[in-house]
Regions:
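Actinobacteria-biased recognition of intrinsically disordered, low-complexity terminal regions
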Residues: 1-7, 181-186
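Membrane-topology and secretion signals of cell-surface/extracellular proteins
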Residues: 3, 8-19, 42-45, 81, ...
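Acidic, metal-coordinating catalytic segment for phosphate/diphosphate chemistry
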Residues: 13-51
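N-terminal strand-loop-strand
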Residues: 39-75
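Conserved Nudix-box catalytic region and its N-terminal flanking loop in Nudix hydrolases
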Residues: 60-101, 164
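Active-site segment of metal-dependent pyrophosphate-handling enzymes
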Residues: 100-147
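NUDIX/MutT-family hydrolases
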Residues: 138-142, 149-179
Length: 186
């Protein structure tokens, strides 16, 4: 199965948590059906990306990275690559690369979708493309509390935060954390 086929199957079968997530799911499925290159960075004005929110095993801490280009704290994630076999594999690769944590186990079922504008998404660093929309498919991974991350070239910092004291008030991130915790904590 190709990455495109996996993305279409995953999102077609996914049960959204609420009406907002369902609308995004439908939008992503429509985009995949309309664009054979929807899983590539070249697809404009929108393409799929994959992300992972890393939680401590007790569900009380979240690992975030201070994104080098955006200058904001995010979950791990990025563009899909041709050799990714699935959305979950891409989410795993991105989280491993950006956190430096080996042995991550990523839940293959997405936990959250996020559509957001990115002004710095370029194929050629010297050629601006305008605003590109990332259709982010987010997963969750759990690691032992206190696991030491490593800062990658894509981040200015990587650190643990209490889930009730994250450095953002963006509802999208707060929803991701809530849904991820609901998925992994009893």
């Amino acid at each position: 199965m190709s990455l495109h086929q996996d993305a279409l199957a995953t999102l077609t079968d996914w049960t959204a948590a609420d009406p907002v997530q369902e609308r995004l799911r439908e939008e992503y499925v429509d985009h995949l059906r309309a664009h054979a290159d929807a899983c590539t960075k070249a697809c404009a004005p929108a393409h799929l990306t994959a992300g992972t929110l890393v939680l401590s095993d007790d569900g009380r801490q979240v690992l975030l990275n201070l994104h080098r280009k955006a200058g904001r704290w995010f979950a791990f994630g990025g563009h899909l690559e041709y050799d990714d076999s699935s959305l979950a594999a891409a989410a795993h690769r991105e989280a491993t690369e950006e956190s430096g944590i080996t042995g991550l186990v990523v839940d293959p079922v997405p936990v959250h979708l996020s559509r957001h504008a990115v002004d710095f998404c370029r194929i050629d660093p010297d050629v601006p493309r305008g605003t590109i929309w990332h259709h982010d498919v987010r997963h969750v991974a759990v690691v032992p509390a206190g696991t030491d991350p490593v800062v990658s070239d894509e981040s200015l910092a990587v650190r643990w935060f209490p889930v009730d004291d994250v450095p953002t008030d963006e509802q999208d991130m707060l929803d991701l954390i809530r849904l991820a915790r609901e998925r992994v904590t009893p």
